[in-house]
């Protein structure tokens, strides 16, 4: 601990008076009762936290390596990092201490840009941006410019290209367009050229509606073989916006009209069913495009956004965020923003009855959003405007499958459906209350206030992939996804690590089978335990991998929790 910080903490100790938790009218914790494992952390605002070095034991070697390689500042420890983030986005000492406790006990984890940049001058704490290109050269150039700035400051980007005319349509008197693909290819090159701080290269996704005349070429855009290599964008992600009308056409095996975005004129027709099969084939073979059922999304947007005439046209890099973009009724261009963090469902039994927990995290996210609005540069003006107007945040989850395995509940069971609903109903109730409480305390977001709604956040929850933070949280299962394998080698930017399912390990220990030989057979069997004859069928069902599960169960579980994602 440096000399200046030590002096500041000594001063804080000498001047300290026990705080009263205004929410519960109880005396606050004794921050300055220290032992061999604890010491004080204080930030530049004077927010003081008692940190516990023994909580490093909550982290796995893989989690520590991930934090060390990508998130720790100079001379910063794991607990220092957690305290830095908690103190920077806390309302006061008591809030900061609770936030630190939540993070260090792995109850929740801020999104990676918050971990990396919160409380520093390295970059911004926002991880998610959505925008759209207008059908003009200025609009395209403006999107490129904005995306360069967003990627350079750590953002993942989702851009809508459906406003642009397709290849061969008229420009002016005699000109013809070259279509959207060449412009997307330039975006591909620009994004790859920009580094997101020290964490990763720039990354972006492009979205197109299913009735755009270039949809067939767009679907194949990331295939390395076939077609013109000059009309490929191999590094971008891409998604297709599927309408209800298209799905009806698929069901009835009808022709599907591909229309000009400029005037709605039909450019060509294709078999809806063949186009759907082509889309699904590309998805099976390459993992993309993403599929967004856009009419379903727009039926579920907040009522105040419907009244304002706003619609969702696109999603983000990871396709879990759906927010309005483009020109609003005030003539301003919106680049949607959502700041993310995720609750750890694996620890659900520890925090489910804590009345402060979800509210504290929502306050944390509100403070993160305010930090972005106050400190983002002028190049982010459209994003700052959108964030100010709608104040959308995305409180997500991770560890759902790990929670099932911890409780020995097969994912393909009635009990998994019961817990799924119960968990997300509980979270929804608490985030809704927090949004209303914060609206009373700090004011409703302008979008909601204009129509008389008392909501601090237009959107409150979102299920992010949590690829990195699930590793930090002890290797819990990512997002709401099932575990891919019970034993495997995980390759990341931090290196390669052998990962073994801890709950399966506990079961094998009880059976006297926790040996390298057993784990070797699991690894060679693609992470499955189906071949282990000493396990019961129910035990095998609990530890089914993602590839062994009936995918209809995943669809059913998603459908059950969707009403509670807002």
Summary of predicted features, one role per range:
Residues 1-566:
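Extended catalytic cores of very large enzyme megasubunits
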């Amino acid at each position: 601990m440096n000399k200046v910080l030590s002096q500041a903490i000594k001063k804080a100790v000498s001047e300290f008076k026990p705080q009263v938790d205004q929410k519960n009218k109880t005396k606050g914790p004794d921050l300055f009762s220290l032992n061999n494992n604890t010491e004080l952390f204080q930030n530049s605002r004077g927010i003081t936290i008692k940190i516990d070095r023994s909580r490093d034991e909550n982290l796995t070697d893989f989690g520590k390596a991930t934090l060390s390689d990508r998130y720790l500042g100079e001379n910063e420890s794991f607990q220092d990092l957690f305290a830095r983030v908690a103190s920077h986005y806390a309302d006061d000492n008591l809030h900061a201490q609770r936030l630190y406790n939540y993070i260090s006990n792995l109850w929740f984890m801020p999104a990676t840009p918050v971990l990396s940049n919160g409380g520093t001058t390295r970059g911004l704490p926002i991880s998610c941006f959505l925008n759209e290109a207008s059908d003009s050269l200025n609009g395209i150039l403006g999107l490129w410019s904005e995306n360069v700035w967003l990627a350079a400051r750590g953002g993942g980007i989702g851009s809508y290209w459906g406003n642009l005319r397709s290849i061969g349509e008229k420009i002016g008197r005699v000109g013809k367009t070259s279509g959207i693909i060449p412009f997307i290819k330039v975006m591909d090159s620009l994004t790859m050229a920009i580094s997101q701080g020290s964490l990763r290269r720039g990354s972006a996704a492009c979205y197109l509606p299913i009735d755009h005349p270039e949809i067939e070429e767009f679907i194949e855009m990331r295939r390395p073989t076939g077609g013109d290599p000059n009309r490929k964008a191999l590094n971008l992600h891409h998604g297709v916006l599927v309408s209800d009308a298209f799905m009806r056409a698929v069901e009835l095996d009808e022709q599907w009209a591909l229309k000009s975005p400029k005037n709605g004129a039909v450019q060509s027709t294709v078999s809806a069913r063949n186009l759907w099969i082509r889309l699904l084939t590309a998805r099976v073979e390459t993992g993309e495009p993403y599929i967004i059922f856009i009419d379903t999304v727009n039926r579920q947007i907040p009522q105040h956004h419907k009244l304002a005439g706003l619609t969702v046209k696109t999603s983000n890099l990871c396709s879990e965020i759906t927010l309005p973009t483009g020109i609003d009724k005030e003539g301003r261009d919106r680049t949607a923003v959502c700041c993310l963090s995720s609750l750890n469902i694996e620890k659900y039994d520890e925090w489910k009855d804590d009345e402060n927990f979800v509210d504290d995290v929502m306050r944390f996210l509100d403070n993160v959003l305010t930090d972005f609005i106050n400190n983002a540069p002028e190049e982010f003006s459209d994003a700052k405007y959108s964030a100010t107007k709608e104040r959308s945040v995305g409180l997500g989850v991770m560890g759902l499958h790990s929670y099932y395995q911890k409780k020995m509940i097969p994912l393909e069971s009635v009990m998994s459906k019961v817990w799924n609903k119960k968990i997300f109903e509980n979270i929804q109730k608490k985030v809704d209350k927090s949004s209303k409480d914060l609206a009373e305390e700090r004011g409703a977001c302008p979008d909601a206030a204009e129509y008389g709604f008392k909501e601090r956040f237009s959107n409150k929850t979102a299920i992010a992939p949590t690829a990195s933070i699930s590793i930090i949280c002890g290797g819990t299962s990512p997002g709401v996804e099932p575990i891919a394998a019970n034993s495997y080698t995980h390759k990341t930017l931090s290196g390669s690590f052998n990962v073994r399912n801890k709950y399966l390990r506990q079961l094998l220990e009880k059976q006297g089978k926790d040996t390298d030989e057993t784990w070797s057979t699991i690894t060679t069997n693609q992470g499955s335990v189906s071949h282990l004859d000493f396990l019961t069928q129910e035990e095998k069902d609990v530890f089914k991998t993602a590839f062994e599960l009936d995918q209809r169960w995943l669809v059913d579980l998603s459908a059950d929790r969707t009403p509670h994602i807002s």
